[in-house]
């Protein structure tokens, strides 16, 4: 059954992916008179570019083909952003048909500018997002307890040592009491990213680093994540809770992707079974789902990631339609959920209308 689901997903994703290519091609040729030679050239570019992403994905574990993988991700981002711009161009052309040709040329220029901006955006280090969250059950002497929330780092063989070193430096400057990571830490096999655990061991917090799995940990093999975490001095929470500084509980559940690999999925009831007192409970859950149920079980704060805040067009527009708590801080009764845009990137090395972030959370006794 998992194999059948995978084949179905690949077929649907492939159809959508190449459909985007055809749409852009169609949008151009129906608006501008082009010679047969130019049309053929565009078709060849679309086919080769489209195949570069799939070829890179299938061959991503092979060394020496990094250029193909990276180029494929760049192409994926270019197509996604361009599709969005051309789609809105075609809607506008319905009302302004006499300007269709001009709008098409303008769309080409806007696409180039947007793609360039998206690439330049990720050259910047993650921004620091500082928030304060009221915590009614937190002892007054613990007010100001500082948590650094990271998520979706997606460490792979494209990740640079300099980027990790900068991340560690920026986190340590915040002098956190606790570092919490909500999944998708790695996106590769351990033997291809083994230089990073020694760098991540330099993360400093008074009460350690705790982490849960994301969906990508299962795609590459959960054992790589577990070994990577152990080497990095990360404590993995798998349907379990830990008491921190005798003032709050941190509960971690695995991503629901675990069930697709015949592994135990998230079980919040089991994870909270041994919590008997009235101290605040912080839940680590990769996807920003299940928050109302978590509140009913006594969770004070849920930390999540996964959405990347869309990362690029058109996902920026679609993610809020898919996830109710897609980005930022939300309140329900006296509990909160914070969904981060992510510390790193997945796929295209681009961001537009969103930034990578390090989240610094001060818990305020109330």
Please place each PLM-identified region on the residue numbering:
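Soluble catalytic domains of enzymes that build or remodel membrane lipids, polysaccharides, and related
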Residues: 138-366
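N-terminal signal-anchor transmembrane helix
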Residues: 65-71, 93-150, 156-169, 173
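Non-catalytic terminal accessory segments
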Residues: 1-124
């Amino acid at each position: 059954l998992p194999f059948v689901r995978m084949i179905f997903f690949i077929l649907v994703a492939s159809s959508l992916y190449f459909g985007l290519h055809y749409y852009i091609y169609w949008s151009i040729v129906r608006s501008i008179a082009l010679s047969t030679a130019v049309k053929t050239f565009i078709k060849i570019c679309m086919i080769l570019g489209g195949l570069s992403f799939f070829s890179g994905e299938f061959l991503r574990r092979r060394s020496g083909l990094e250029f193909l993988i990276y180029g494929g991700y760049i192409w994926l981002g270019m197509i996604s952003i361009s599709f969005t711009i051309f789609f809105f161009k075609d809607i506008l052309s319905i009302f302004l048909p006499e300007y269709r040709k001009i709008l098409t040329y303008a769309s080409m220029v806007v696409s180039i500018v947007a793609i360039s901006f998206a690439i330049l955006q990720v050259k910047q280090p993650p921004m620091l997002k500082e928030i304060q969250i009221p915590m009614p059950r937190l002892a007054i002497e613990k007010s100001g307890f500082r948590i650094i929330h990271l998520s979706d780092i997606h460490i792979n063989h494209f990740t640079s040592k300099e980027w990790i070193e900068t991340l560690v430096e920026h986190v340590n400057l915040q002098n956190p009491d606790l570092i919490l990571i909500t999944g998708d830490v790695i996106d590769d096999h351990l033997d291809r990213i083994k230089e990073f655990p020694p760098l991540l061991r330099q993360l400093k917090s008074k009460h350690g680093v705790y982490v849960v799995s994301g969906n990508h940990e299962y795609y590459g093999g959960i054992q790589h994540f577990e070994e990577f975490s152990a080497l990095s001095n990360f404590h993995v929470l798998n349907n379990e809770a830990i008491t921190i500084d005798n003032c709050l509980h941190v509960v971690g559940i695995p991503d629901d992707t675990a069930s697709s690999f015949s592994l135990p999925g998230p079980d919040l009831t089991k994870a909270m079974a041994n919590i008997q007192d009235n101290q605040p409970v912080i839940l680590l859950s990769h996807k920003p789902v299940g928050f109302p149920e978590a509140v009913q079980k006594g969770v004070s704060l849920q930390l999540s990631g996964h959405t990347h805040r869309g990362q690029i067009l058109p996902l920026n527009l679609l993610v809020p339609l898919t996830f109710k708590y897609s980005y930022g801080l939300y309140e329900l009764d006296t509990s909160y959920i914070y969904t981060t845009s992510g510390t790193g990137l997945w796929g295209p090395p681009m961001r537009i209308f969103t930034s990578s972030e390090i989240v610094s959370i001060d818990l305020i006794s109330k």
